[in-house]
Amino acid sequence: MKVFYWSPFISEVATTFAVINSIKAIKKFSKNKKINCKVIDVFKEWSSYQEILDHNNIETIKLKTSLNIKRLPVKGFLKSRFTYILVFFFSIIKLHKIIKKEKPDYLIIHLISYIPLILLNLFNYQTKFILRISGY
């Protein structure tokens, strides 16, 4: 079974550890099943967590966009919205191709959720989409 995590973030948020802990829990409590969990790395945002991911045997799928989070404007309302628009245009087609090619059983959506939800409405995937909202 393939489980992919969509959680692109533009600043440090607790959701990153929620994703890592979720994958660790799936691996720990599903010993009878062969479950392959992967995090989709949209714009190199997961590179600063690579050591933690490697330590926990968590694979990443590089979307290979030309975007780099360290070079994108993230502070302020308008600048962050501009970044969200860039992420949309640079990632929507690549995410669609990954879902079509890899055919994950589940796509767990954490952040910037409108991109996979738009794809869900446009295409008939076999993949089940799970929208997970963290916080309060």
Which residue stretches match the model-derived regions?
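Conserved donor sugar-nucleotide recognition element shared by glycan-biosynthetic enzymes
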Residues: 15, 19, 88-91
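N-terminal strand-loop element at the rim of the active site
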Residues: 5-13, 25-82
